[in-house]
Amino acid sequence: MDRVRFKASGPPLRGWLLLATVTVGLLAQSVLGGVKKLDVPCGGRDCSGGCQCYPEKGARGQPGAVGPQGYNGPPGLQGFPGLQGRKGDKGERGVPGPTGPKGDVGARGVSGFPGADGIPGHPGQGGPRGRPGYDGCNGTRGDAGPQGPSGSGGFPGLPGPQGPKGQKGEPYALSKEDRDKYRGEPGEPGLVGYQGPPGRPGPIGQMGPMGAPGRPGPPGPPGPKGQPGNRGLGFYGQKGEKGDIGQPGPNGIPSDITLVGPTTSTIHPDLYKGEKGDEGEQGIPGVISKGEEGIMGFPGIRGFPGLDGEKGVVGQKGSRGLDGFQGPSGPRGPKGERGEQGPPGPSVYSPHPSLAKGARGDPGFQGAHGEPGSRGEPGEPGTAGPPGPSVGDEDSMRGLPGEMGPKGFSGEPGSPARYLGPPGADGRPGPQGVPGPAGPPGPDGFLFGLKGSEGRVGYPGPSGFPGTRGQKGWKGEAGDCQCGQVIGGLPGLPGPKGFPGVNGELGKKGDQGDPGLHGIPGFPGFKGAPGVAGAPGPKGIKGDSRTITTKGERGQPGIPGVHGMKGDDGVPGRDGLDGFPGLPGPPGDGIKGPPGDAGLPGVPGTKGFPGDIGPPGQGLPGPKGERGFPGDAGLPGPPGFPGPPGPPGTPGQRDCDTGVKRPIGGGQQVVVQPGCIEGPTGSPGQPGPPGPTGAKGVRGMPGFPGASGEQGLKGFPGDPGREGFPGPPGFMGPRGSKGTTGLPGPDGPPGPIGLPGPAGPPGDRGIPGEVLGAQPGTRGDAGLPGQPGLKGLPGETGAPGFRGSQGMPGMPGLKGQPGFPGPSGQPGQSGPPGQHGFPGTPGREGPLGQPGSPGLGGLPGDRGEPGDPGVPGPVGMKGLSGDRGDAGMSGERGHPGSPGFKGMAGMPGIPGQKGDRGSPGMDGFQGMLGLKGRQGFPGTKGEAGFFGVPGLKGLPGEPGVKGNRGDRGPPGPPPLILPGMKDIKGEKGDEGPMGLKGYLGLKGIQGMPGVPGVSGFPGLPGRPGFIKGVKGDIGVPGTPGLPGFPGVSGPPGITGFPGFTGSRGEKGTPGVAGVFGETGPTGDFGDIGDTVDLPGSPGLKGERGITGIPGLKGFFGEKGAAGDIGFPGITGMAGAQGSPGLKGQTGFPGLTGLQGPQGEPGRIGIPGDKGDFGWPGVPGLPGFPGIRGISGLHGLPGTKGFPGSPGVDAHGDPGFPGPTGDRGDRGEANTLPGPVGVPGQKGERGTPGERGPAGSPGLQGFPGISPPSNISGSPGDVGAPGIFGLQGYQGPPGPPGPNALPGIKGDEGSSGAAGFPGQKGWVGDPGPQGQPGVLGLPGEKGPKGEQGFMGNTGPSGAVGDRGPKGPKGDQGFPGAPGSMGSPGIPGIPQKIAVQPGTLGPQGRRGLPGALGEIGPQGPPGDPGFRGAPGKAGPQGRGGVSAVPGFRGDQGPMGHQGPVGQEGEPGRPGSPGLPGMPGRSVSIGYLLVKHSQTDQEPMCPVGMNKLWSGYSLLYFEGQEKAHNQDLGLAGSCLARFSTMPFLYCNPGDVCYYASRNDKSYWLSTTAPLPMMPVAEEEIKPYISRCSVCEAPAVAIAVHSQDTSIPHCPAGWRSLWIGYSFLMHTAAGDEGGGQSLVSPGSCLEDFRATPFIECNGGRGTCHYFANKYSFWLTTIPEQNFQSTPSADTLKAGLIRTHISRCQVCMKNL
């Protein structure tokens, strides 16, 4: 309570002083009661009666001896949370979050560097796409790309066991800012520590509180008038010299005042004090209140005497003050008379320490023996001191103790005090009391007393009387008990020293105490014992009369004497006793001192409760610790997954007859004597404790198959497999049933007499034929299932099905074979001893036992071999250097981590060496229609390329336009009928000449299909169609034969049955190249031949035929009208070639027939002559999208292009809309591609087809390197034949597209692959009945007449046998499209399973199919090879002037081409691209390239490498940094050392690796090491560099944006990167890069792009004090916004780093 102050507010309160005294005394009791037990109501007090009075506590005794060390207490309760600290610094990178969802497809990367300029070719118009070339050789393996950025850390592992304490780290003094940055959060209160060993005796404690007031001394004589003193305590005297630093004072009582700081929290007095917290921020001014009185410091030097103050009001007696210095004795005053014994004065409570010295206390306990001090000399008498310091108000004088007042009344219970009240006014001085009893022991004195003045020899004083026992105090009233629910608090702080107790009974005289320690000189004591005889004093004042006078009145108290002068320092006193521990002091603010020596080891504490798992620390991983002791056995883990069954063990064998146990199972075995009999098996032991997880076992043998489980649910259908190759041809099917009698046919012209054929057996009756007007029947039943086909190619793996439902448990499997012996279990507890059994006979060798159940894990085994290196952990903050640990055990392989986030686009790699020619890339997307180019120069004809892979099957074409009807021929002469002619079928006659064009006749009745006619010669090439034909079957690819002679179009023959497979023809010789001819006019279409709807098997691959000569130009013939009815003849011999018939009359238009079957493919014509150059055509239709390319490699990011020149709006002339054909049938699926024919003659311009819908885009091809150029390349060589393409899937037919604009005439395309025969079309409607013919006599063979009108259907003849294979007929012209007929009647399916026939011969090339609708784009096929070069197009118009590209690499030397014809002079071309940088006289610029990997970088194209080395960033010597410009050659040291320099002093002495100097190097992307790396381990972390000789200076340009900046005009790019500005490391030293230097543009971005190497230690490491500074992205509004603070985590950093490009001037 002596720390509570009251300040009287003025005179009105003085009257309440007595009441305040009592009240405060009671309050003190209630307050002090706060430390009592409060966990029961009323703190355990009996509140039923009145308040019990507790006697006042006596003075504190001497400290007892140090007790024995106590036991470890239990862990303390968790303390209350400490105050909220200031906001911490930015934390390190957090633990990676869970893998996010897959991000959207990122933006397309920047374009790669432009390649080197090629040698300009002759400008020519691009030919059509050539055939694909063969695959090129695989390229050489490129240089390794730059190391990717470090992957994000894995998920935090489980906390490992507590490692041993690491070695003490190196001290590092942080600056104040760094201390603030790295200051940790206040820790939790620690556990109670062990009792330490007794410490050394501490320094003498501070002066204790004052004792009770002693009796007042006799008044001294008035001293001489002092010099004017300061006015009371209110004014300050002259500043004294700085005193010695006092010891820290004890802590004040905790206050309940809430201090409002930056963070608002209430300070509770009962909280444990935590460790020293961080330095708080500047608080706002607190509540103004007077603080506690500090402990009096060491005395200052003596001040000047103050002026006399006015007499103050008599103040209340203050508490005893600190003893002042020993003043000199004043002049002796007149002797007073002895006063009467006064009554004992009352105990006075004063809130202030008393200044009066108490009476001598009881002897203290035996103190420790100190060194005997030297005896001091008697001091001189001092002069009278100045008035002592007043206590309380300025003008009050110190009063004497008052008498004990009467007992006051009980006051009202006061409300609990929240704040300290003001001090009360000083009371008036009471009358002097009698000497009090002995006070409590005085405080320990200071170590060094002040030397007193030499004193005068005093007289012996009388012995004091024993004091009487004090009177008993009054019993107080019972206190109010507040019996509310009281929560037990923590132990309170030690209470203040209590008031002095009432005088007790006189004790016995104590033993002589040891001499006390020297204390600070006190006030003058009572008269001492007789001293040593002093020197004679001066003559005294005349004494009183010897006569007895009346007793004088007690004199007034004398004025306090003037302060004496400061005496000399006294002899050091003995050490005082240890004081009690002080209250915790306030947090100090000194700088953290160096670590002290290690203390003695404490007693091991009890195991604390496990703390919560803390968050992962942020230090760098510490070194690998020593191997720890085996940990306690953990709780049993969950049962592991059953391992695979082991292989059967070898059977054990017990040989009791030999006395030896064979080591079958391995290990040392005991000897069994002959006649041994094993005892019965003991009961199983108790399970042993589980062992640690064993190492991963070797893979066991596969177990036996278990019982089949229930069938799972059907999975989702897989992707359709590729179509298989055609099966072998089936057996010939049975002959069809005989048809019904048909309508009579028209009499044909008599044929030549045929050779007699063998008589065929009569055929069965056929199915009724079609009757005019009959409706088609319903669809027949489905046929029987065919034989299983051959196994198809495996389909693509389907998507995984859903997980099936849990199957029913299977039946118990068969008993498995015994497995390997299980691991040894823990030894079981001993079972009870069995009874002694009889000895058994030796057993036979038993069968192999079943495997034992796996034993529980054993105890920790011996130390294993070092495990595999673990996965590198995330980079933490630097940890303290730990003890070097043993290698830990190998951990089990973890589960694969979740997929990481999609990384940012990596930095472009270093340009590798030019690789070998790679495989051709896939076609890119169809580009937009370009502008019409200028006419180019004719290119030189390229060499013949290889044949390409056949393309995919085309989509069905639309039906062609019906041709005009041909002329009617003249009637032939009657045939000469010879005997036997009607019995013999004649052979087919020769082909007649082409008839004249007839008029259009009426459409005849649909006749029955005739027997197959002889194939005609191939017709001339038709005009190229714009629309794809019907997708034909894929034949076996043959090598393309040379085109045959063109035949004239014969009349349509009847399609024969499929022929047998022909043998492969011989390979023809290639024809000579024709001269350039003019484009011939388009030939007429021939008649379309009928086909029998039996599809032929795919033919074998034929050899390449001889090149045919160009066919004659045919007339545009049509189907002739029916001739006059000839005499009926039998089939005659082949007649001579007839002359052309007369032109027939025009017939009526026939009915539209159904779409006929697809004709056989025609032969491939020879290439026509090259036409003259035409004028530029109108723009062509957009091509179909190309097939999907394989994924290209990621190109280097390109530079941002310049804005292109504005294009010319040029639309072609609108074309005529083409007719919309009927929708064709869906073609059969292609199996193998046919051979590519030679190009046909150039056809006339076809009518444009309808525009198909846009196909789905193919996959993205390789990004092309497209330097702008307006010069077309020359046509390439003809490629070699391609390999067979795989069959694509059939795409569904698409809807008809809108009418397209007319396209320009395209270049002549290559002939398409030969198609298979189409499917049989529907039977057309029957034509009108013809006139009946008369039977004629057999005539001689006349000339072949034109085909007559269809006659009536004749009676059905017998079905003839299959005739021999006829000769190949001519190719017919495309027929007119028929109208859709009504469906035919369904055939009766034969119920026989037909074997597939053998592979038939390759059919002839069919006619162009009808125009089908454009189907949707099928799935992308495999990439094709390079096509043959197209013809040179006409010269294009001059292109727009292009931006100069960059210089590319020089291509390889081309082959010598043939001498081309002289082309027409072209228009002047645009300026060419800049050439290679030439060697100049002034060459000698240096360029440094840093790879930021451990691979040497390549110099840019055209530059020589001068040397390569290691990328030096800067040095640090004598704590100063010396920076290197990364763009200059000095940053590329040829050799690496952690200490590449030494230092020399002026004394001609140099030192190497003797200081803490450092070197800093650009680093690689190698994973951050846990510990500093040394020697060879350093190499993967140091970036390599090359110094190149450049023809011009290189500069860096920075975009201050995320986009790549452009090089200035006339400069080319060398590399792109990130804008590196500066760096700092140890000691806040560092450097920076000039932003114009290439060193400021690093190709790769890292948060820490360099590593620190310590020269003295020879190690390198990434320490936490490295900072890199980069230019950031700045929005365009430069002055319109204030930068906003932001923290970027990993993954977002590159979005705020400026990009840059290093450019070199083109010379």
From Swiss-Prot:
Domain Collagen IV NC1 span(s) in chain numbering: 1484-1707
Skewed-composition ranges (Low complexity): 74-84, 203-213, 524-539, 669-684, 716-725, 732-744, 784-794, 826-839, 1262-1275, 1322-1338, 1374-1389
Disulfide bridges in this chain: 1499-1588, 1532-1585, 1544-1550, 1607-1703, 1641-1700, 1653-1660
Sugar attachment sites: 138, 1270
Processing after translation: Prolines at the third position of the tripeptide repeating unit (G-X-Y) are hydroxylated in some or all of the chains. Type IV collagens contain numerous cysteine residues which are involved in inter- and intramolecular disulfide bonding. 12 of these, located in the NC1 domain, are conserved in all known type IV collagens.
3'-bromotyrosine: residues bearing it: 1485
Role: Type IV collagen is the major structural component of glomerular basement membranes (GBM), forming a 'chicken-wire' meshwork together with laminins, proteoglycans and entactin/nidogen.
Protein name: Collagen alpha-2(IV) chain
Source species of the chain: Mus musculus
Taxonomy of the source species: Eukaryota, Metazoa, Chordata, Craniata, Vertebrata
Gene of this entry: Col4a2
